[in-house]
Amino acid sequence: MRVMERIEAVYAIAQHRAAYSPEEDAAHELAAGWMREAGLEVSRDVAGNLFGTRGDARVWVGSHLDSVPTAGRFDGVLGVVAAIEAAARLPDRPLAVVA
């Protein structure tokens, strides 16, 4: 299952990915690659948020890739990975994935 494999790939970077840390940056780079594979245009804003967009997006979905020490492997990353998977399965729909 691709969703679980991707969650494990992010978790393998580090269990704890503090905001603005090298570990969170690595998770963003991994997610950016998956967004491109899903046909999304990837960008970052000045605050460091990662966006994958297609078309005139009116629906935004996603979550966060940083975590706290005791949050567990699904904290934040599940929402990001699920949103990327939805984008991959809906190639003709305008949407945005936010991480």
Where are the language model's segments positioned?
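N-terminal capping segment at the start of a domain
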Residues: M1-S21
